């Protein structure tokens, strides 16, 4: 096939000589051209065809001539040059500049009928120098204002949700860091956990205050679920942290009380149990203390001897030694075996 494709251009002068009666010199000078003087080209299938010139090929039928229409708005006439194949919507957009009315707030009346923006001029019978009337539509204007407010509200809600999402992402990073610390056996300050929970709850309040519809509502719902999941995770970490702190306090308290308990156990072992009231010794220590602590002079002030006082004499009796009385007081009474009767 490649050999055939290469050989075909070499045989062109011969074909030209047979068709046009020219010699080989004329064929060589033509450089692969036909008698008409047009270039030839080989298609991918190997067919030799005449080369096309895109500049000479007709694109389509010529466009129709422009028409001029007159539009009355109030007491003023506006002349607009436009193609008859254009639509009334395109004509309204062209009237926005001269009249200052938004194209959605315009009504075009042609032959006492309101024309739809999608209708074409030539189909509706509009010709050159046709007349129309432009009327401002208050209902359309109100609808457009409501739509603009709705769009602005949606954009504002979307921006607010986007800002909240960034803040939730930042707080989510802290929650992940807390989880890693807990998994490694570390401890987290309860103050830090409470602070992050409060920040997440603030973001949740902001999300609840946003009123949205459609896709923005779905975005808000997704962010609410994220915040709730983070709060639940922090609550679980808070419980684990409090349990760990409680166990640590119990262990430290047990370590402090261990020597005290050992001392109490030793004292209990040293004490002997009292089986009956008869085994309990009678104590005379209190009586002895009262006797010894009683002062000789119970009066107030220093003792003064009066020389004029009359003294009465008594018979002398032998004084019992103090040691014997003290010994008697300190002596423990004998124990008796008492017999009880019903």
Swiss-Prot record:
Q: Which residues form the BAG domain?
A: 160-238
Q: Name one GO cellular component term.
A: mitochondrion
The protein's matches in InterPro entries, at most eight in alphabetical order, are given as: BAG_chaperone_regulator, BAG_dom_sf, BAG_domain, Ubiquitin-like_dom, Ubiquitin-like_domsf
Record field: compositional bias (Gly residues): 18-34
Record keywords:
Chaperone, Phosphoprotein
Q: Does the keyword Thylakoid apply?
A: no
Q: Matching Pfam families, A to Z? A: BAG
Ranges where the Ubiquitin-like domain occurs = 65-141
Residues bearing Phosphoserine are 298
Q: Which GO terms fall under biological process for this protein?
A: cytoplasm protein quality control by the ubiquitin-proteasome system
According to the record, the residues making up region (Disordered) are: 1-41
In this chain, composition skew of type Polar residues spans: 8-17
Q: MF terms per GO, please?
A: protein-folding chaperone binding
Function comment: Co-chaperone that regulates diverse cellular pathways, such as programmed cell death and stress responses.
> What PANTHER family would the database entry show?
BAG FAMILY MOLECULAR CHAPERONE REGULATOR 1 (PTHR12329:SF11), BCL2-ASSOCIATED ATHANOGENE (PTHR12329)
> How does this polypeptide assemble, per the annotation?
Binds to the ATPase domain of HSP70/HSC70 chaperones.
- Which named protein is this? BAG family molecular chaperone regulator 1
Name the source organism. Arabidopsis thaliana (Mouse-ear cress)
């Amino acid at each position: 096939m490649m050999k055939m494709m290469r050989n075909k251009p070499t045989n062109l002068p011969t074909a030209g000589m047979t068709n046009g009666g020219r010699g080989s010199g004329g064929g060589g000078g033509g450089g692969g051209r036909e008698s008409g003087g047009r270039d030839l080209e080989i298609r991918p299938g190997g067919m030799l065809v005449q080369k096309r010139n895109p500049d000479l090929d007709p694109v389509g039928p010529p466009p129709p001539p422009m028409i001029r229409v007159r539009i009355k708005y109030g007491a003023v006439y506006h002349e607009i040059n436009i193609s008859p194949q254009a639509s009334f919507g395109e004509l309204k957009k062209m009237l926005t500049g001269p009249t200052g009315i938004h194209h959605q707030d315009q009504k075009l009346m042609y032959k006492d009928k309101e024309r739809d923006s999608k209708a074409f001029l030539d189909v509706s019978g509009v010709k050159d120098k046709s007349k129309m009337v432009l009327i401002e539509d208050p209902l359309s204007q109100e609808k457009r204002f409501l739509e603009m407010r709705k769009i602005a509200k949606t954009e504002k809600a979307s921006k607010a949700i986007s800002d909240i999402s960034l803040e939730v992402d930042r707080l989510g990073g802290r929650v992940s860091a807390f989880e890693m610390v807990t998994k490694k056996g570390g401890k987290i300050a309860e103050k830090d956990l409470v602070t992050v929970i409060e920040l997440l709850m603030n973001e949740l309040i902001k999300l609840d205050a946003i009123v949205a519809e459609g896709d923005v509502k779905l975005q808000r719902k997704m962010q609410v679920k994220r915040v709730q999941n983070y709060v639940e995770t922090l609550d679980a970490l808070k419980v684990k942290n409090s349990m760990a702190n409680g166990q640590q306090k119990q262990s430290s308290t047990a370590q402090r009380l261990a020597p005290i308990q050992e001392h109490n156990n030793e004292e209990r072992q040293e004490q002997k149990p009292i089986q009956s009231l008869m085994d309990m010794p009678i104590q005379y220590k209190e009586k002895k203390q009262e006797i010894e602590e009683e002062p000789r002079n119970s009066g107030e002030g220093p003792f003064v001897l009066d020389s004029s006082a009359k003294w009465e004499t008594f018979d002398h009796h032998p004084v019992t030694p103090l040691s014997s009385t003290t010994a008697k007081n300190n002596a423990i009474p004998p124990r008796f075996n008492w017999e009880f009767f019903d």
